């Protein structure tokens, strides 16, 4: 994928702040500090474009990144950080639900989980939420450089079993550090847009 332009256009907490151009979107969901910002930076080959936070749970807005003036990556607020107050968790839930239930431009959701660990109850709930709202789900298994390639299938099987994934749904191991899996991930991003009738320029 040739990246000609990329910019953050909006940080939103309610519908009135969402972009209104009708440009298609793919959203990234995952636990706090699972690596969403790092994945965005890696996909765009830009360092510190999407800011990585040292404070889990800090991102509480929906961030829209416009790529090549053709499509959006949407960075959803991280979940699962125990030290966040109950009121903040409820606020997060409202922000997420409003986006997922009403966003016609949203094509698919990519759920990020740490390949080293069994998905958490929050990951399972997020997966079920994605399916409840009728979206395709692709799982990105982050931090793939932390285990050997020979262990990939074992860990992917654990992820599939814990989330109770459909056999047709993909799990893609990705390392932001070593760029492992980035090409396959781009192919799947383009594929998801194509499935929804959008032609994305790849070169």
From Swiss-Prot:
Biological processes per GO annotation: division septum assembly
SUPFAM superfamilies, sorted: P-loop containing nucleoside triphosphate hydrolases
Binding site for Mg(2+): 37, 59
Entry keyword Ligase: no
Ranges where the EngB-type G domain occurs: 22-195
Cofactor requirement: Mg(2+)
Xref: Pfam families: MMR_HSR1 (PF01926)
The keyword Acyltransferase belongs to this UniProt entry's keyword annotation: no
GO molecular function annotations of the record: GTP binding; metal ion binding
GO terms under cellular component: cytosol
Described purpose of this protein according to its UniProt entry: Necessary for normal cell division and for the maintenance of normal septation.
The name this protein goes by in its record: Probable GTP-binding protein EngB
Lineage: Bacteria, Bacillati, Bacillota, Clostridia, Peptostreptococcales
Gene: engB
């Amino acid at each position: 994928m040739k990246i000609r332009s990329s910019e953050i256009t909006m940080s939103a907490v309610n519908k009135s702040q969402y972009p209104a151009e009708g440009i298609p979107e793919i959203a990234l969901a995952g636990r706090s500090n699972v690596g969403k910002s790092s994945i965005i930076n890696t996909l765009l080959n830009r360092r510190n474009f999407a800011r990585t936070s040292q404070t889990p749970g800090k991102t509480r807005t929906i961030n829209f990144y416009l790529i090549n003036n053709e499509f959006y990556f949407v960075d959803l607020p991280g979940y699962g950080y125990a030290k966040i107050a109950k009121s903040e968790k409820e606020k997060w839930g409202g922000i997420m639900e409003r986006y997922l239930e009403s966003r016609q431009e949203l094509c698919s959701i990519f759920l990020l989980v740490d390949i080293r660990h069994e998905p958490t109850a929050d990951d399972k709930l997020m997966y079920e939420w994605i399916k409840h709202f009728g979206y395709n789900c692709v799982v990105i298994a982050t931090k793939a450089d932390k285990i050997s390639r020979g262990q990939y299938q074992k860990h992917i099987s654990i992820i599939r079993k814990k989330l109770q994934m459909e056999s047709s749904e993909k799990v893609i191991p990705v390392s932001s550090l070593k760029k492992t899996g980035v090409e396959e991930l781009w192919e799947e991003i383009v594929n998801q847009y194509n499935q929804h009738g959008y032609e994305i320029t790849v070169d």
